[in-house]
Amino acid sequence: MDIQRSILIVALAVVSYLMVLQWNEDYGQAALPAEVSSSTAATPALPDTPADTASTGGDDIPTAVAEPTAAAVAPTAAASDELIRVKTDVLDLAIDPRGGDIVQLRLPQYPRRQDRPDVPFQLFDNGSERTYLAQSGLIGQNAPDKSSGRALWSSEKQSYEMADGQDSLVVDLTYSENGVSYIKRYSFKRGLNPQCSAREQQLKKPGCVDPSAYQVDVRYLIDNQSDQAWSGNLFAQLKRDNSGDPSSTTATGTATYLGAALWTSDEPYKKVSMKDIDKQSFKETVQGGWVAWLQHYFVTAWVPSKDSTNLVQTRKDSQGNYIVGFTGPAVQVAAGAQGETGAILYAGPKLQEHLGKLSPGLELTVDYGFLWFLAQPIFWLLEVIHGLLGNWGWSIIVLTIIIKLIFFPLSAASYRSMARMRAVSPKLQALKEQHGDDRQKMSQAMMELYKKEKINPLGGCLPILVQMPVFLALYWVLLESVEMRQAPWMFWITDLSIKDPFFILPIIMGATMFIQQQLNPTPPDPMQARVLKLMPIIFTFFFLWFPAGLVLYWVVNNILSIGQQWYITRKIEAAAKPANA
């Protein structure tokens, strides 16, 4: 009995240690920034003029080999420094005409806070407190973007909005220089299905929100009417400062992973943290690939053509900003001819299935940690259940039942072993009284008793340990999946991804652990018995800050376990009565 309990306690301690170790390795970040005040009633509008930190050229722009040393680019007469506003049903963004970069972007379908649904989460920003933007351009001989300055693009309007009934929106920026005309074309898609109700759209019901609407197709159309050939390279990159992740407030108050990731020839998913970039830059030539910046629940990624050979790299500019991007192959346009190049920008939630379709390996940005091979099928099953029930809380309950059925034989073996141990508890107590403090003789006598009664002292422990990886995998599923963000269950549980605001579920969980403990055999060691009695209290304390969805899983699992264990225990005790008569 001592061996069984000791192994179980040590195993739980080891698992907890590994969990904390992995968490620190993957998610340890700097302290979070203070939350932006939302005391005003209306959503604050994006500013119409770019911040002073907007790029006008410098070491944040990659330098092409053939780039000439020239004076700063002269803007066209009709160009303006005023930001160009673009609004679709899922994106609200601003483009800086200097360089044509997306410097601000909001997600109207993802409120920053649940109690303020009118304030959308802001992904990109280029203000005095935070720098995070998506840059792209053309570099090389006679190309418009140089380290000495960026092109100043023109547009027909200063504001574009996708109208009702409109399925797409195209925003063209124009620029001309040295007989070459350029169009930088942003193409957007409608995301919300008008056949769905506003509530169904808000809950992200299947078929109500098109994930591809978070993709922005960025194309460069080049019309070379000069008398010489034109050559240039497309570059696209994400630039960010070292400010904290505004979306990373988790149930435990711990910051999740914030950093770059990219596809390489050797690794379909390579994380490059800010610390890694501080130490050294990274460069590699790949076929296709992608580059991304990760934060809790959301990801931005540049995806070039899968058929192109690209130089992917990470670096740090002189202003301390971190950059991850790629430079494409040279584009040649003969005199009097036209050419084009481009890439896809994804800026939105971490939607695993869609990201995998967009580019191989991009689905791994939904980072489930070292148990991803268990977490991915668990999430798939959870998503299937949600498609039938339409509520993530009830889906977790059904998932718990299914997992319990899968592990039913193992659990039954564990409970049978515990029931037999419970039945021989009086004999164990007698052995303790017989041998006193002689632990060696006590252990030998216990082993002989286990052998005589055909009891495996590890029988109640190992089945529980087998289930621990599933529990940890589910933990990461609930933590990392954006589908759980602000997902309600019922009554007071309005967000399954954060802690229970009234701590009701953790208290219920502690009560179920206490009840289940009464069904287990009492260890002969009084000190061990006292420690085990404290376990429900200790677990309740730690679970106070766990995601409500995870605590819900544990509560339902405990209730099912109590029923199963009670039935098996009573059955074995009933069978033992005639034998003892």
UniProtKB/Swiss-Prot annotation:
Gene Ontology BP terms: protein insertion into membrane; protein transport
Cell compartment(s), UniProt: Cell inner membrane
UniProt membrane topology term: Multi-pass membrane protein
Keyword Cell membrane listed: yes
Pfam families assigned to the protein according to its UniProt record, in alphabetical order: 60KD_IMP, YidC_periplas
GO cellular component: plasma membrane
Subunit structure: Interacts with the Sec translocase complex via SecD. Specifically interacts with transmembrane segments of nascent integral membrane proteins during membrane integration.
Homology family: Belongs to the OXA1/ALB3/YidC family. Type 1 subfamily.
Chain's role: Required for the insertion and/or proper folding and/or complex formation of integral membrane proteins into the membrane. Involved in integration of membrane proteins that insert both dependently and independently of the Sec translocase complex, as well as at least some lipoproteins. Aids folding of multispanning membrane proteins.
Name listed for the protein in its UniProt record: Membrane protein insertase YidC
Annotated organism of origin: Ectopseudomonas mendocina (strain ymp)
Protein encoded by which gene: yidC
